[in-house]
Each structure stands twice: as C-alpha cells, then as structure tokens.
Amino acid sequence: MSDNPAILTLAADKNYLRYFKKYQIPALTNLGTGFGMGAIITTFVLGLSALDGNNYAPAALVGNLGAVIGSIISTRLMLRFTRRSFGADAMSQGDGGVPLARDYRVVRQGSVASRFLEAMLDGGKVGVQMGIDIVPGVLVICTFVMMLSGGPADGARYTGVAYEGIGLLPAIGEKLEFILRPLFGLQSPQSIAVPITALGSSGASLSLISRLVGEKLANAHDIAVFTAMCMCMSGYLSTHVAMMSALGYSRLTGKAILSHSVGGLCAGIAAHLIYSLIALIF
C-alpha cells in the first residue's frame, strides 16, 4: 500500500522466497504494483471534500474494490505466462541456482549488533538503488504526459505558466469518447489525462485530479474510477522494468506490462460498473 517497489525488499529476502514456487516470483511485481500508493491515493481522495464539500468516501471505497479486482486479473494473467515458462513444480532458487527449502532458514552471521547494522545498511542500499532505477522513468513519462495534456493558459497564446502543453490528450479523449464513456463513464474528455499520467506516476496524477475537481470537470463517479486506475496502474511503466530487473526476470517485462495494462483497464471498468450499480440502487 506504500509504493510498488516496496515488495522488492521482501523479494530480496530468501526466507520469504522459500514459500513461493519459481513461476510465482515474477508475478510479485504485478501484485505489488496493484496496490502501490494505495494509502496515499485513498487519503488524498478523502481530502478532496475540502474543495467542494462533497463526501468522497464511498467513491474511495469503490475505487479500492476496483483496484483489488484489477490486481487479481493482472496477477492471474502474469501467472499464466510464467507457468508456461517455468512449469508449475519448480521451487524458487537462491544464490547459485540452489532451490530454497521451506524447512531451512537463512541466518546472517555475527552477533546481534552486527546483524542489526548489516540489515540496516542493506535496507538503505536497496532503497537508494530503487530510487535510482525508478526516478528516470517517472520523470520522462510524467513530463511527456504533461506536455500532451494542457493547452495555452488563456486559450489563445502561450504565456509560460505551469501546465501548458499542446492539448493532444484531451483531443484524443474527445475522439474516443464513444468508447471511453461506456467503459469508464468519465464526465470530461480531459479526464483521460489522469489514467495516462498514472502509467508513469500515480502521485503526479493526483494533482490532475484536484484540478479537475476544482474546475467541476470530475464528479464522485469519476473519482471512484480515478482511484481504481491510479492504484492499480500506479506508475507501472516507470517501475516494472526496474522491478523485473531486480527480481532477475527482465525477459518477462513485456508480459508483466501487458498483464498489468489489462488489469488497470479492468480496474477502471469494475469501479465504473460498481459505482453505477450502487447509484442505481440507492
């Protein structure tokens, strides 16, 4: 629920990996990404009520449910791919390709103090390395999306203020509205920028959500869809490559991205259908 790469700290623990079969380990990337930034996104959505006075708690709950559905679909699809590659019986492997036994626990050498210090240093090193691996993708994709999202500030000419761009994504949203509205039920064509930004960074997409709510371009239904897609996608284009590389399965990165693309779309569709059903009943 904190961030996608947080699951890599568990994947680096041989005592944790011994409970998994080999084909299940690459799917940890999809499972971890499915709930990445979940706590931050949900808290942010609940705070949107300060902008217009509406209660967005039901939308946040529906969005979380949609993210769970999308994560299940993404992980299951990835497991189908990995099961074909590694089989269903091979156990996870440690250093040197030796299978990890469930009844054998790896223990650090040395005293309690030295093991504590070594664990602290290893944790810091893993955290710094994850940041170095992820930041370039986040910067590139988010900058690219921002350039394609906004238009001139005053509608006629560019002034150099924040959020100016060429306005391509809203134009695409208008052209594809006949598809996007039945699938996601989004109120405004500009809303398409939110899930696209979430491909690179769900944190960056939050600023777009607050702007849409402030300009009355998004309602509670849209917030539910945004929550589901931002949680499930959670910047996977910028993190999947680094996460799969850290796990040692770079050749499966394409399949992981494909699986999560389907899962993210299903999360948004599920949130749309669930919220519409609840609104119809109540």
What function would you assign to each model-found segment?
Residues 62-74, 90-104, 134-144:
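Hydrophobic mid-bilayer segments of alpha-helices in multi-pass membrane transport proteins
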Residues 24-33, 97-102, 155, 186-191:
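Alpha-helical transmembrane segments of integral membrane proteins, especially early/N-terminal helices
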Residues 51, 79-87, 150-155, 276-281:
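Transmembrane helix-loop junctions in multipass membrane proteins, especially transporters and channels
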Residues 108-202:
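Transmembrane helical segments that form the transport core of multi-pass membrane transport proteins
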Residues 4-73, 198, 202-282:
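C-terminal transmembrane helix pair
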Residues 1, 176-188, 210-221:
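Membrane-embedded helical hairpins/re-entrant loop segments and their flanking transmembrane helices
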Residues 91-103, 162-166, 195, 226-231:
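Juxtamembrane non-transmembrane "cap" segments at the membrane-aqueous interface
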Residues 79-125:
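Intrinsically disordered, low-complexity non-transmembrane regions of multi-pass membrane transporters
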